[in-house]
Amino acid sequence: MTGEKNNARTALFSAFVLVSVAALTIVLTSVLLSRTGLPFAAAYAVSILAAVIGTCAASYGGKTLIALPSPAIISWLVYEEIIARGITWQEMLGIAALVSLLGAVLTRTRYAAALQRALPATVRTGLVLGLSLTLLMTAALHARILLPSPWVLTMGGTLSDPLTYFTFTGILLVLVLWARKLRCALPLGMALIALLTWAEGFWEIPAAPFLAPDLISLSLVLTLPQSDFLLSLPLGMTLLLALVIESEAVLAAQTDAAKGTRPLARLFTVSGFAALIGAFPLTIAPISAALPTEKETHGSAGIPRTALLSALLLLALLPCAPLLAALADFPAVPAIALASIGLMLLVRGLEM
């Protein structure tokens, strides 16, 4: 009984860590999509719902895999394809739906596992280390710890900047709590910094912090490209490769490569149907690779307990779009989450 309680407590703490990053990632991608004319509240709601279903589907019968829209892929689609090329977001949803369904078919063939088996151990380690450095660099840029410079490659920020100060303090606080073997180090550190920055007035709690989820306004709005359909083929193939490569980079960190294509096939299927309600494609998030490699406890439905708790916590955040959007206005807390997960991945990569 004691071991069962410890497993449940460990799963709950891991779920808090994962959801802390996942929720802010969804807010970031929803803000990006809102720049194309897509309503933020609707994009947030359908992304949460798609992430919940995708996480359960990808994790079924295996390890915990968190499914999220990729900030890198969404940024490319928003700035390069929708804004620069003039493709409407409805057409992009249609392309994403076709690409996801094609990916679901291709990843169910017998040759799909060859890609992951072909990756040597050094490449797997390099992918994990690359993901960790990417997250650390993103956190440093968002927190203005590193600044672009016209004279040198980059330059450091100063602690006189409140964003840099609170982010750096939060990272040190999380490291100290983690060194004290406190499992909830990341959520606790993020909560303390969020409270301090709110008390200092760097962000405000909205007058209406909760909002009824808008899950129907984007339903069945996707369309196929209205111009020459052949011109969309390079975009579709590039999107398919990007989705596969980003997910494979996380799956490559797993020791069991034979199971790598099954969660990817299920995730593509979920993404294809999620496009019908207005959600953009999902990938297996890099935070999934930060989890321990030991065998997880599965629930009665065959879903790992950590994945199930993460999905429930994400579902609880469904009406919290205004509150999370306000928190992201001063990105100290998101930067702490990204930096902490990046450090976890760095340690994981060095131990591989």
Show which residues each predicted segment covers.
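Membrane-water interface regions at transmembrane-helix termini and the short interhelical loops
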Residues: 101-118, 141-150, 169-184, 323-324, ...
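Hydrophobic mid-bilayer segments of alpha-helices in multi-pass membrane transport proteins
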Residues: 71-72, 96-98, 165-172, 185-196, ...
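Short, amphipathic, aromatic/basic-enriched membrane-interface segments that mark the entry/exit
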Residues: 13-16, 34-42, 59-66, 152-163, ...
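Inter-helical loop and helix-membrane interface segments of multi-pass membrane transporters/permeases
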Residues: 34-38, 79-88, 114-121, 133-175, ...
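Helix-loop-helix hairpins and the membrane-proximal interhelical loops
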Residues: 1-42, 155-156, 186-261
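Structural signal for alpha-helical transmembrane segments and their membrane-water exit/capping regions
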Residues: 97-106, 137-142, 181-182, 196-208
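Loop-to-helix transition at the N-terminal end of transmembrane alpha-helices
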Residues: 36-56, 262-263
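Helix-loop-helix junctions within the multi-pass membrane cores of secondary transporters/permeases
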Residues: 2-30, 50, 59, 64, ...
